[in-house]
Each structure stands twice: as structure tokens, then as C-alpha cells.
Amino acid sequence: MEATDIWGEIERSESYLVCSMYEEAESLSSSILKRIFGNIDVLSDEASQGDHQFHDMLESAGMVLVQSLHGIGRTVEIVNELRDVFGEVAAIPVQVLLTGVCLQISNGSYLGVRDILEEFFRIWVYKDNHYILNDAGVSTKGFHAKNCLDIDEYMEVVELYTFGVLAKFSNDMGLAISWVEKAALPEERRQGILRRLHSLLSLKTASSFEENSKDSSYAVVNNKKSLGNEKNDEIDSFLKLSKQHEPWSLWSSHPLSLKVGNTQFSMSRGKVAVSLVGLIICYALKRKRAALIRIIRRQMESTRKAIVDFWKLAFSYQVNPLAAIQSIPSTTT
């Protein structure tokens, strides 16, 4: 029971993968695939469901292979490993191809990706609303794989190629649009992809225009800054020259020197100015002092005189001490 044994091995490789035993899973899945391709005729005769079960074996073992390669850090080798193990691109199940390519692209590696996808498109032909293998380009090994694809499976590969490789990696939206327009695709699906590509192109164009506008704005600002700096330099130079030709000022920071005999005194002009102002104020106050004293004396004298007059007036008023007990004389009628 060759098929039963292979399924048991596939389940064991899946267990390794679940347990994160990636090296064991990779080794066993690769061995299973080689064993399958070494016994194609026997498996085709023993499989109760024919090629359908054969395809399921390839798909299950292939999924373990690509995920285990990713787990052990060999993601960049996935496409090349698929070619080596399966031999023919036609023999690689679509889901295995998609998963492997996506894992490799997500790791930032496009090594062999474009070549394997373009070879995939060459061997599948659109006919009667589905895709079939082009027998002229497929060997006996590939012919035993699934030889018919529905539209949804094929379109998944188309979208990965147009958006993930041409539009993103090659950064050529025009090439992606041109390829879709010429590819053998159902018209409704073609128009859907073209609309998405044109939308992306519009967004990219708008983004580029915005970046160019920002660059232009930055250039204008930088030019203005440079002009401003030049003007500031000119102003600084002018100020320096004006300081050099500045007339003598009492408030200047340069010190004044005075030599008396063998002794030399040095004092800043600011201190000299403050001292002169102080002397002027003292002189003015001294001259005003006598006048101020006279004014104050006159005011004090007038105040004292007013107080004395008030008291004299108060005590000069005669009061009769018997007025309180004398009766008021009555009038006669």
C-alpha cells in the first residue's frame, strides 16, 4: 500500500512542522516528494481517486516543504528548491507555488520569482472558461500532476505577478498594465485588474507630484534662507564698520587714562560720566539748600503764629459763672 505509507509520512512531517521541528520537517517532506515522483506509475494505479489523490499528496508535502524552509531561515531558496524537487513548474501545485513565492517576497527576495511565474503562464492555456496544460511544453512528469485549473486559481497567480512583481518590485506600473491587456484572461477579470492598476497609478502620480512640490518648496525656502543669510552678513559687516568709525562717546567702554607724575590712573568712561552727573546734582542741591531752608522757616513761623492766635482768641472770651443758676426775668404785662 504505497499511497497509504506516503500519507503516513506526510502526517508525520506535518507533526514536525507543528512542533517547530523545521529541519526534520524539511528533510522528510523533501524525501516524500522525491519518493512520489519516483513511483508515479505505481501511485496512479493504486490511488483509488486517481490523479486527484496524487495532486493532494503533492500539495500537502509541498506546503510542509515551503513552510519548513521558511522556518529554518532558507526563505530565499524556496523558488529554487521547488524547481529542484518538483522538476517541472507544471508539477508544482498552485497553492504551493503561491505560498512559496509569497514567503520569499515577504523576506525581500525576488530571486527566480519572475522567471518561475512567467514560465507558469506559458504552460497554461485559457480555453472554455478554464485553463489547461499546454502539452507541447510539459514532460511526462508534469503531465501526471493536475492538468486543469479553474479561473480563480489562475487569477491568484496573475494578481501576484502584476501587483507583487511588476508593479512593486519592478516599479513599472505601465508594464503591468500592458501585460494585463495582452494576457489571456476573462474580460471581466481583466477589466477589474486594470481598474485597480489605474487607481494605483493615479495614487502614485499624485504622490510623486506632492513630493516634487515639497522638494520645490524646500528649494525656495533654502534659497530664501541663503539670501537672508547673505543680507545678515552684509548687515553684520556694516555694523562692524560703523563701530570702527563710531565717534568718541562718554559712554564708550574704552577706558580713560590719567597720568599724575609717575602714577597712571585708568577709569572707564561710564564711571566718569556717572561721577560727573553726581557732582552736578550735589552742586545744584547745595545752591538750593539756603532757599529751601528759608521757605521752611517761613512756613513754620506762620504755622506757629496761627496756633498762638487761636489760643489767645479762645481764652479771651468771658464766661459768667452764675449764668447757670440765675432765673430769666419775667416780663410784666
From Swiss-Prot:
Matching InterPro entries: APEM9
Name of the protein: Protein APEM9
BP term (GO), one: peroxisomal transport
Gene: APEM9
TM region(s), chain numbering: 91-102, 269-285
Membrane-related topology note: Multi-pass membrane protein
Peroxisomal side: 103-268
Function: Involved in peroxisome biogenesis and matrix protein import. Required for pollen maturation and in vivo germination via its role in peroxisomal function, which partially involves jasmonic acid biosynthesis. Transported to peroxisomes via the interaction with PEX19-1. Required for peroxisomal protein import by acting as an anchoring protein for the AAA ATPase complex, which consists of PEX1 and PEX6.
Subunit composition and interactions: Interacts with PEX6 and PEX19-1, but not with PEX1. Interacts (via N-terminus) with PEX13, and (via N-terminus and C-terminus) with PEX16.
